[in-house]
């Protein structure tokens, strides 16, 4: 889908020490799944702390289009009246997913085992992302796909009921593919199995169980086997969404690299399949302390105390990559400020995200004077040992390529730049972290927001 482009630049300049407390908004992954599973339950579910970014709102609108009644009350709690597994309605119009790959891929799984047809469309960035890794297993279950060249959006999915239960071994670590198959398995007679050689985020498994799905997880020599027995009735739930660790990452890294900073990021989800970044930052010498550890909605949560730190270079082990795949852009910024040479490889997946995150980050870091080597599957970065990035008096321009994590990563880089950073378009930030600028302002760093042009 083509939309007119009206860029809204963001300017980030060297910041004073960051201090204060901020409360990170709800987790995007959990917010998506809460809406989908509540819409497939029988009865009324309640969701507190839902992330109200554009991606999650696209999921809400899609579930409305398929029959769910979804509204927000005056206190900010979301009420979802579900239609039940197997009872989704035929959407009358195309489902516009905006920039959300998660919405698109998981909802394709939902549609695949229902007797309905849905056309998925998205923005320019999403329309470039390959969907073959989703259509391949769902086709084995009987769904039919009609797509643009290269298995890209727009894509029409025609579900099959009864769908065919499958046993599928994931060729690459992907929580989205795993989740799509499990969601398709919800309305499929028999047992659908996913074999996961490398663990990925497990929100789908946790939440499916919580809603009453008949799901089991076995582990055998590091391999996870997830089995779902289809056609169970989902029960409505009251979900409290913990804070998003992927969003908190930008605040935490800023606190580590801006000299003199001392801050607290509250309400951060620390699911072990999502917290790899914090493990790596601590290994780099980052002063991060977990305060008030607790459980929220079945997920581990803590407040993070963060102090400016002299970071050391790191080599990221391949085993931890799936637990921090979305956080590598901001880890690249941390590595650029560290002492020594960091090796960050095994990241080929980054080339098919909202942008080619390896190439785009390499281009931007080079513009800031960072010495690096680009590999097919990652970057080798020579850090500045805490010296500011770029040159005094020289503003560096960065193209975000419609990618929220690129835009936010370089906004953080601007806080330790000598001449400032201009990001060409801040609008993608609204997809996942609409209060990004507001929270940084509360900590003492104010971004300049350019006018629409």
UniProtKB/Swiss-Prot annotation:
Q: Which GO terms describe its biological process?
A: amino acid biosynthetic process; aromatic amino acid family biosynthetic process; chorismate biosynthetic process
Q: Give the EC number(s) under which this enzyme is classified.
A: 2.5.1.19
- Per the record, the major location class is cytoplasm
Catalysed reactions, as listed in the record: 3-phosphoshikimate + phosphoenolpyruvate = 5-O-(1-carboxyvinyl)-3-phosphoshikimate + phosphate
Q: Which residues bind phosphoenolpyruvate?
A: 28, 101, 129, 176, 357, 405
Q: Which SUPFAM superfamilies has this protein been placed in? A: EPT/RTPC-like (SSF55205)
Q: Could you give a GO molecular-function term held by this entry? A: 3-phosphoshikimate 1-carboxyvinyltransferase activity
Q: In which pathway does it act?
A: Metabolic intermediate biosynthesis; chorismate biosynthesis; chorismate from D-erythrose 4-phosphate and phosphoenolpyruvate: step 6/7
Q: Where does 3-phosphoshikimate bind?
A: 28-29, 33, 174, 176, 326, 353
Q: What class of enzyme is it?
A: transferase
PROSITE patterns per the UniProt record, alphabetical: EPSP_SYNTHASE_1 (PS00104), EPSP_SYNTHASE_2 (PS00885)
Gene Ontology cellular-component terms listed: cytoplasm
Family recorded in the similarity comment: Belongs to the EPSP synthase family.
| Known function | Catalyzes the transfer of the enolpyruvyl moiety of phosphoenolpyruvate (PEP) to the 5-hydroxyl of shikimate-3-phosphate (S3P) to produce enolpyruvyl shikimate-3-phosphate and inorganic phosphate.
UniProt protein name: 3-phosphoshikimate 1-carboxyvinyltransferase
